[in-house]
Amino acid sequence: MHPQRSANPIDAIAPDKIRPRNMLPNRGRHFLRQTLLATLLGVASAAPLMAAPLQLPALVEPASQEHHVGKVIFVELVTPDLAAAKHFYGGLFGWTFRDISAGGTEYAEASLDGRPVAGLIHKNVPPGEHRQPSWLSFIAVRDVDAAKKIALQQGAKVLFEPHSIPDRGREAVFADPQGAVFAVLASSSGDPPDVLAAPGEWIWSSLMTSDPDTAAAFYQTLFDYEVFDFPADKPARHLILASDDYARASANALPANRPNAHSHWINYVRVEDAVKMAAKVVSLGGRVLVEPHVDRHGGKVAVVADPMGAPFGLLEWPDTESKEVNK
């Protein structure tokens, strides 16, 4: 989801393995070049506690003015313990942090090898409330105010009104019709390029929802996604959301054994060894929610939570996936 220095875009699967869903009309017939990464399991997350706008650095430096509508271009953690979060994620992924303070709000920019990978916001949870810390996905748009209008027309709720942040761009936070919380961002400097994430960077996003078909239709209307069954030769267990010939995310059914789970987004960090990293999560005070296992695409995934309870995923994915797709 973030810029890389020496990685190339990765290809998708052969075109005979996917098909657009008939119930969701698409405007084009493109094949995907992004490796299809998804998971079957997830955990519920509560609505994020949003902080006041800050003056944040540009998302892309130098500015590229390259835009990829529908791509998850940034993530932010809302946490009640910023120091503990920095200790955990720094120890787990080798992230370094730069503190930014404005208007009484504590914010830390996380970087890996000099490249921004995330933002961390401190927000206390009021006594008596049980809101779970969470990671918030920012999806690229060109016009935040237009996105708000479409989202409301499609049954979404506005949790944080459109607002501009100097150097960063304009953003807003919504809850989709099933209640999953996400943000939209029109970056003033452009979006990160479409390249394979390095270990320690975000590589994939999954929407866990009570109604994948309805959810996919909502996001398709909002971001002009193409929607694909995967795999095409089996009953759809999850849907792929694509734009610009790249898979951007998946929409998956919530596990049947979690009847009280809420719809939510979960983001995955690429790792070299999911088993070792899951053990490291525990050693740093976190928890393993879904044990490492091989998913349908051949990658090894796990779902974990930081010491404050914010869930995220680990995804072990090889560099060798570069199959050419002929249109």
Positions of predicted regions on the chain:
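Vicinal oxygen chelate
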Residues: L49-H67, G70-P80, A108-A110, P126-I150, L152-I203, L207, F228-D244, ...
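Short loop/beta submotifs within extracellular cysteine-rich repeat domains
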Residues: A85, W95-F97, P116-A118, G128, ...
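Active-site-adjacent scaffolding segments
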Residues: S101-V117, I121-S189, V195
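Core segments of cupin and vicinal oxygen chelate
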Residues: V69, E76-R115, Q153, L159-G169, ...
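Non-catalytic, C-terminal membrane-associated alpha-helical segments of glycosyltransferases
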Residues: A249-S250, H264
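N-terminal secretory signal peptides that target proteins for export/translocation
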Residues: M1-F31
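Bacterial N-terminal signal peptides
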Residues: Q34-P48
